[in-house]
Amino acid sequence: MKKLGTLFVLFLSVIVLVACASGKKDAASGQKLKVVATNSIIADITKNIAGDKIDLHSIVPIGQDPHEYEPLPEDVKKTSEADLIFYNGINLETGGNAWFSKLVENAKKTENKDYFAVSEGVDVIYLEGKNEKGKEDPHAWLNLENGIIFAKNIAKQLSAKDPNNKEFYEKNLKEYTDKLDKLDKESKDKFNNIPAEKKLIVTSEGAFKYFSKAYGVPSAYIWEINTEEEGTPEQIKTLVEKLRQTKVPSLFVESSVDDRPMKTVSQDTNIPIYAQIFTDSIAEQGKEGDSYYNMMKYNLDKIAEGLAK
């Protein structure tokens, strides 16, 4: 009997351990999923789908460059503890100094189990003349159709980790993507009415290739991506010479870059900088562009206004 009692205790212990190990952090357990997003854009899309069902940490601060970043001790801790990690992929956080690759490796996280690229399924555009892995243009979110892909990928992984809240996530996803889709369609109509000779988006970084393809507006830039030299005299000279051959009425400068190179271009061409726009980050809470939807609406409105001058 003593032997049987011992075996029963061991059996019960195993059952308890298995139950603890297999339990999901969902509404049933009373625990929220711990979710990490690499930047403010992905964090905002996640928040629109998950609401208060998760504990969310965004790594790269608002207004900072996600191409090359040095994670803080808090970022390392949050990543190590995370149930789910969302990153952009396509050469954003894994290009440059590869800060994200190092972060998840040190946190002992596994791709497609613990961390997921929200850009999965996007029709990738490459940097000019560099159609190869590691040379992808990462700025897919600047096409609202890709923002919808991001949202669907996020909702899919949230539902997989937290099935008890699947209906909640799917309801929010539908409402959110309908809103993005409406803005996308309205914006395409708006750009169709701008004269062809004025259609050129001029920015500091060449981040608007996805935007250009979506809304039928070519783009020009000083430098192609933030991981290369930025605003050299040769880069500025090349753009100035190009702009002198056009009738483009306005220039734009991004919120997360040094505006001095674009000011030089403006002075040399007598083309005014019409507005500051958003690429790699949303704005601070309470300011124009303080969500993914708001930053895209702001960009689309300002670019259309500037090119219609």
Swiss-Prot record:
Signal sequence region: 1-19
Lipidation (S-diacylglycerol cysteine): C20
Key word RNA-binding present: no
Membrane topology type: Lipid-anchor
InterPro entries cross-referenced by the UniProt entry: AdhesinB (IPR006129), Bact_metal-bind_prot9 (IPR050492), Lipoprotein_PsaA-like (IPR006128), ZnuA-like (IPR006127)
Lipidation (N-palmitoyl cysteine): C20
Protein name: Manganese ABC transporter substrate-binding lipoprotein PsaA
Organism: Streptococcus mitis
